[in-house]
Design a protein with these regions (language model features):
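ER/secretory pathway lumenal C-terminal domains and tails of membrane proteins involved
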Residues: 1-228
């Protein structure tokens, strides 16, 4: 309910009262409830909302995930039945509670994208991401993170056309265009050229050498080192 976000829950406590995974809808219903039994008493005697489990189960509606394009048909067999959320802190901020609320209700009917993924660290969801060039998609496919600079799986058949044909880079390749500090900073912060390298690396892993070389050359053409 709106009042839960407007007037309450700037911070919500998380306990491990239940030591098994609890389904995410049950968690949100528990927080949503105004029943005093769903509250924790603070030192000053006031009652506060809380989450009674640190392990939360997010069921995967596989047919919805396929129909909405979250997962490609070729990756059907890679999907897990349940995504397990592991809350690593003893409290969550309001924006983090909103993420749980969204996950509880989206039922895999539409993709969830983000550009900054580190908010997911507190949920243990970094291993359920797909890198699509300049954004990350939440997917029900487990891909353990080995390198903090290479978060998420890559579907090269999807990401390469995005980098090659969909994204626009303006006139950055024109030497007459002045790339000022802010342009260089933003492109560096977004690891803009690294996206080409990551997708090319996946193409190489699949032994698609010519495509990988072409993509790397394109990255240098669109964003030459003389500019960025």
């Amino acid at each position: 309910p709106k009042h839960k976000y407007t007037f309450n829950n700037d911070m919500i406590y998380v306990t491990n009262s239940i030591d098994r995974p609890v389904e995410i809808k049950e968690v949100i219903d528990f927080v949503r409830s105004d029943d005093p039994r769903s509250k924790v008493k603070l030192a000053d005697g006031t009652l506060a909302d809380y989450i009674p489990a640190k392990r939360i189960a997010l069921p995967v509606n596989k047919e919805n995930a396929l129909a909405s394009g979250i997962v490609a048909e070729k990756d059907r067999d890679k999907m897990v039945d349940t995504v397990f959320i592991n809350i690593k802190k003893n409290s969550l901020d309001k924006n983090q509670l909103m993420i749980l609320d969204m996950l509880a209700n989206f039922d895999w009917k539409r993709p969830i994208y983000m550009t900054q993924v580190y908010i997911l660290q507190d949920f243990g969801l970094m291993d359920y991401l797909q890198f699509d060039g300049y954004a990350y998609r939440l997917v029900p496919i487990l891909t353990p993170t080995q390198n903090p600079y290479e978060i998420g799986r890559i579907d090269a058949d999807y990401a390469a056309p995005l980098l090659r044909d969909t994204f626009r880079y303006g006139n950055l390749k024109d030497p007459r265009v002045y790339a000022d500090y802010f342009i260089q900073y933003n492109l560096s912060a977004a690891h803009a050229r690294d996206a080409f390298a990551r997708v090319a690396k996946e193409l190489l892993r699949q032994n698609r050498v010519a495509e990988a070389v072409e993509l790397l050359d394109l990255g240098l053409e669109r964003m030459p080192t003389s500019q960025v």
